[in-house]
Amino acid sequence: MAFTLYALIQTAILFTNAIAVLHEERFLSKIGWGAEQGVGGFGDDPGIKAQLLNLIRSVRTVMRVPLIAVNSVCIVLLLLFG
């Protein structure tokens, strides 16, 4: 497989899909990354764990509908052009 722009875009889509399907109660809480784990005090700098949890929640919230459209376009392109 050649290293193309389409391959990079497809990699980003797959990575975003992987983040979007992570379920907080079924998966993240089992490894200690549940909702109550990343709470910090006011004025405290959030740690890397809290920032990653916020990123995961944001991706799941904001990218749910656009991912459906992007995945559909990607599937159609793969069907048409192989």
UniProtKB/Swiss-Prot annotation:
Coiled coil: none annotated. The chain crosses the membrane at residues 2-22, 62-82. It is found in: Endoplasmic reticulum membrane. Signal peptide: none annotated. Keywords: Endoplasmic reticulum, Membrane, Protein transport, Transmembrane, Transmembrane helix, Transport. It comes from the Eukaryota. GO terms for biological process: brain development; endoplasmic reticulum to Golgi vesicle-mediated transport; organ growth; positive regulation of extracellular matrix constituent secretion; positive regulation of protein secretion; protein transport. The keyword Transcription does not apply. Pfam families: Yos1. It is a multi-pass membrane protein. One of its GO terms (cellular component) is endoplasmic reticulum membrane. Regulator of endoplasmic reticulum secretion that acts as a key determinant of brain size. Required for secretion of extracellular matrix proteins. Required for correct brain development by depositing sufficient extracellular matrix proteins for tissue integrity and the proliferation of neural progenitors. Acts as a regulator of the unfolded protein response (UPR). Belongs to the YOS1 family. This is Immediate early response 3-interacting protein 1. The gene is ier3ip1.
